[in-house]
């Protein structure tokens, strides 16, 4: 039986490719997709979900827009990474359908209530929508199997020296998620920076030759340009968000550890930092499965294989 998942995202090039991977995988049953502000403004990220589902001919999936700003802060967006639209590069179709007439949290709650089995929440943007769901619907916590997030880092940040972007946008929300008591799986920069797509991988995807693989290659063409900056020291572009979906499909591609994770919300230099108790120094029981390594070639092969689904 396919694993029921609820995807909360802020497309974003890598979010878009996570959607592509999830919907090409019969092992997963995508019950709904909600959008959050983050990589772009809330209006643009919602539109990008609708555009991607139109491209993939999956207008049957319920979609709802989420919080327009973090719980306690002003919104920060990553338009320098993802462009004016949030998905700059390819020519994507206009949305062929409308979102549900409800909020992201309402759609999430409805999805959980109606599911016969616990649902896995996959969150690849700021954690605002998920935190609002957890705070407003404690009676539904038992309907959540786990929360798989792209966010955080044990080591270096990518938005500040200490913080990864998704967590930095709304650290208070991320702290709610990590301390919720629900199993959390963290795909942080320690693993996603190893999940790099090289130019030759992009050409491999393009050569598959279907409309979706072509769009994915064009998304990566744009994403690769930003990551050419020598400060990163990358060979290619880190494909952050699809690591969450790949972990659900093939966890054997990843190395992970069980550790306690907290989020710094006050520090002068460290706001948004995910504090991972790697050496068990706090005495706190582990609350997260933290990915630390990936079989890069296996990850690329998985994506290439699933892109053939769209032939």
UniProtKB/Swiss-Prot annotation:
GO cellular component: cytosol
Active site (record annotation): 240
Organism annotation: Escherichia coli (strain ATCC 8739 / DSM 1576 / NBRC 3972 / NCIMB 8545 / WDCM 00012 / Crooks)
EC annotation from Swiss-Prot or TrEMBL: 3.2.-.-
Gene Ontology annotations of biological process type: nucleobase-containing small molecule interconversion; purine nucleoside catabolic process; pyrimidine nucleobase metabolic process
Any one Pfam family match given in the protein's UniProt record, by short name: IU_nuc_hydro
Protein name: Pyrimidine-specific ribonucleoside hydrolase RihA
Isomerase recorded as keyword: no
UniProt-listed CDD domains: nuc_hydro_IU_UC_XIUA
Family from the record: Belongs to the IUNH family. RihA subfamily.
């Amino acid at each position: 039986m396919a694993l029921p998942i609820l995807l909360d995202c802020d497309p974003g090039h890598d979010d878009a490719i996570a959607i592509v991977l999830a919907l090409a995988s019969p092992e997963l049953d995508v019950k709904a997709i909600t959008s959050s502000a983050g990589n772009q403004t809330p209006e643009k990220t919602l539109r990008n979900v609708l555009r991607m589902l139109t491209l993939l001919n999956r207008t049957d999936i319920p979609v709802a827009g989420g919080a327009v700003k973090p719980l306690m802060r002003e919104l920060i967006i990553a338009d320098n990474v993802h462009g004016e639209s949030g998905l700059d590069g390819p020519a994507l179709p206009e949305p062929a359908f409308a979102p549900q007439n409800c909020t992201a949290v309402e759609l999430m709650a409805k999805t959980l209530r109606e599911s016969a089995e616990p649902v896995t929440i996959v969150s690849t943007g700021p954690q605002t929508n998920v935190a609002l769901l957890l705070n407003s619907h404690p009676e539904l916590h038992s309907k959540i199997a786990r929360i798989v997030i792209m966010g955080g880092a044990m080591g270096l940040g990518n938005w500040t020296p200490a913080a990864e972007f998704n967590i930095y946008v709304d650290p208070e929300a991320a702290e709610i998620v990590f301390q919720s008591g629900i199993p959390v799986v963290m795909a942080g920069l320690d693993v996603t920076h190893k999940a790099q797509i090289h130019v030759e991988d992009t050409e491999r995807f393009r050569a598959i030759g279907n409309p979706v693989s072509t769009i994915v290659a064009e998304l990566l063409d744009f994403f690769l340009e930003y990551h050419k900056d020598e400060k990163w020291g990358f060979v290619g572009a880190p494909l952050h968000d699809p690591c969450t979906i790949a972990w659900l499909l093939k966890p054997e591609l990843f190395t992970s550890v069980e550790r306690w994770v907290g989020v710094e919300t006050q520090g002068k230099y460290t706001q948004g930092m995910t504090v991972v108790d790697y050496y068990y120094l706090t005495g706190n029981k582990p609350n997260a499965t933290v990915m630390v390594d990936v079989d890069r070639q296996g990850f690329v092969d998985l994506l290439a294989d699933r892109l053939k689904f769209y032939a």
